[in-house]
Amino acid sequence: MTDEADADLQPFAAPPATGAPAADKPARKPRRAAPRTSEFRIAEQPAFVLHSYPYRETSLVIDVLTRDHGRIALVAKGAKRPHSALRGVLQTFQPLSLSWSGKSELRTLTGAEWVGGMLPLAGDALLCGFYANELLVKFCAREDPHPPLFQHYLVTLTRLAHGEPPVQVLRSFERVLLRETGYAMTLKRTVARRAVEPDKLYVFDPQRGVRDAGSDAPSHWPVIAGQTLLDMEEDDYHRAQTVAQSKTLMRFLLNTYLGGTPLATRQILIDLQNL
């Protein structure tokens, strides 16, 4: 990324990640059992608004992704009033500093400040941002913090805002999302522990990982070139084949892990840009 893009990342410098190595099986990692509902007051937490909806006559419920507390729901009292200071602050795709109080699953927003330093999304980049938000809502459980995922979401928005190719940005985000929510599998070796070879063909078992292509594989498993898998492992999408096959693979995996639940924004992207 450019120096300008790097500057955009400074407001929310994430703490060092201490995640475990990626596992070969997609069995989800146990949810953190920390009793987050016992926390009464949190001040100035880095956050992004993922979604909001009306609550009673003058308020909103905002679904937010926070760096250290995961995804939580907050009541923004009076946010729908015409002259509320919150109306211009609680915007999607903008870095915020939020404070809240309460012990229930629905906390009360007590403060919100716009941090700034990020360009707004527009056009295709805006649609991609909504797609990323929908994935976060679908895959991230309440109060299950993933600081590395929070930081990569920030990077994703920055890359989109600076006009980087959406296909590459989304594939990178999808892989980090699956890794952080417990579905990580290596792409550079097979389930038999053999190194993936660039000139061979493979299938992807959603429960175990990369397998040699063969007649015993279900027909709906995507057939992927070894070169594509190796490129994806290195986050390299300059080959046209890698772009096309990685899209097929990630669409298959996301659909499988979501139990076939459709993504509204994914269909919009398919219809408009085939992303």
UniProtKB/Swiss-Prot annotation:
The entry's keywords: DNA damage, DNA recombination, DNA repair
Source domain of life: Bacteria
Gene3D superfamilies: Nucleic acid-binding proteins, Recombination protein O, C-terminal domain
GO CC annotation terms, alphabetical: bacterial nucleoid
Biological processes annotated in GO: DNA recombination; double-strand break repair
Biased composition annotated in UniProt, kind: Low complexity: 11-24
Region annotation (Disordered) ranges: 1-38
Disulfide bond residue pairs: none
Keyword Protein biosynthesis: no
HAMAP family: RecO
Function of the protein: Involved in DNA repair and RecF pathway recombination.
Family stated for the protein in its record: Belongs to the RecO family.
Name of the molecule in the record: DNA repair protein RecO
Lineage: Bacteria, Pseudomonadati, Pseudomonadota, Betaproteobacteria, Burkholderiales
